[in-house]
Every structure is written in C-alpha cells, then in structure tokens.
Regions:
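Terminal amphipathic alpha-helical/low-complexity segments used for targeting or macromolecular assembly
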Residues: 1-79, 190-213
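Left-handed beta-helix
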Residues: 79, 84-85, 90-91, 96-105, ...
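Right-handed parallel beta-helix
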Residues: 125-129
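C-terminal segments of enzyme domains that contribute to small-molecule binding surfaces
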Residues: 131-150, 180-213
Length: 213
C-alpha cells in the first residue's frame, strides 16, 4: 500500500478532518450543524472512517478502533459504501446520496472532493510484470454518478467527470470530461460543483501543490 498522505495521527487532525467533511455539507462547524449533518449518510460514514484511521495508530486505542470498525461495517452494509478506512483520502470529502460506491483501498483521493453514487475506483494488473496500478485523484475533483476510474490514472486538481464516464487516461487541471471513454470537452473547473470548503484545508492544498512542483 502507498505511504499515507493523510494519516490522521493527532487528535487535532481528527477534529479538523471531521470539521472539514461536515463543512462541505453544512457550510458550518457549529454543534447544531453537526447534529443536522449526523443524519446525512455520507457524513456519518466518513465520521467513522476518520475515527478508524485515527484510532488504528495506537495499541491503547484498540477498543475504540474495534468499535469504530463495527460501526463502519454497519453503515457500509446499510448505505452501500465500500470505502475502506485504510483508503488515503484528504479532508473535506463529500458523498452525494447513498448507494453503491466502490473504492479500492490503494486508491488516493485529495482534499475537498465530491464522490457520487455508482462511482468505482479500481485497479489494473500488469500480468507480465506482476504490477498493480491504482487511481489517484487530485484536490477539488468532482466525480458524478456512475463514474469509473480504472488503473494507473491521475485526475488533476479541479477536474470534473460527468455522469457515467469511464476514465482510463489521465485528466489535466480543471478538465471537464464526459463519455466512454472519457474525453475532455472544456477546462472550466469544478468550482460550481465543489462549492465552499473549510478554511483549514486551504493551506493543506497549497502545500500539496508546492510539493508536487
């Protein structure tokens, strides 16, 4: 499994990740907003997913880790989300509606991304060289209903992938892609789809951009 970019090792990190996820739904981090967000399937699932990731790091957290894994498994079956807690996902994840979503645990998803019902992120296998390839998603990326992202594919920051598209090749920054296979039809970016995000995630995105240059 690739080295984690978003390990959530400190309790302050856990609070920030949960707040960033909640902000994507409620545009607020107040206690009342948390109570309203708790009834949203996507937020409830990511809450336990983040907790699993945090509590997995220390032996004395093992009881809480096991409880969170049980809760995560329950909501995985209830909502149809197959997003393992080990998956490397940045803060500010928004899951639109509940239904089948399948993410390979070795995939990587950036900060402030949208995932919709029917999204699949899967591997490809180079049989000759015995190598597996997994998708990576940048920041502020929006994947619409039924999108499939397969294999050694990188979708750059700000990209939008339309309903039912199958992505088998990389997409550049702010690309808008549709179809099977996905083809770029514009470079207008994802601002209209991603919307507002938690201020604490902005420096994280800036640091990630600097690190990639």
């Amino acid at each position: 499994m690739p080295q984690a970019t978003y390990p959530i090792k400190k309790f302050a990190d856990l609070r920030m990740y949960i707040a960033a996820d909640m902000f994507r739904y409620m545009t607020s981090t107040r206690a009342k907003a948390f109570l309203r967000a708790w009834y949203i399937a996507g937020f409830r699932y990511t809450f336990f997913m983040r907790c699993c990731r945090y509590y997995s790091h220390r032996l004395w957290h093992r009881p809480l880790f096991l409880l969170c894994r049980i809760a995560l498994r329950h909501y995985s079956v209830k909502y149809g989300f197959q997003i393992p807690w080990q998956t490397d996902i940045g803060p500010g994840l928004m899951i639109g509606h509940y239904g089948s979503i399948i993410i390979n645990p070795n995939s990587r998803i950036g900060i402030n991304c949208n995932i919709s019902v029917g999204v699949l992120m899967g591997l490809t296998h180079d049989i000759e060289h015995h190598v597996f390839y997994y998708p990576t998603i940048g920041h502020r990326v929006s994947l619409a209903n039924g999108v499939k992202v397969i294999g050694n594919v990188h979708i750059d920051d700000g990209a939008v992938v339309g309903v039912g598209a199958v992505v088998t090749a990389g997409l550049d920054k702010d690309a808008v892609a549709v179809g099977v296979p996905a083809r770029v039809i514009a470079h207008t970016g994802s601002a209209a789809y991603v919307g507002s995000f938690h201020p604490a995630t902005i420096p994280l995105m800036n640091e990630a951009v600097k690190a990639s240059n």
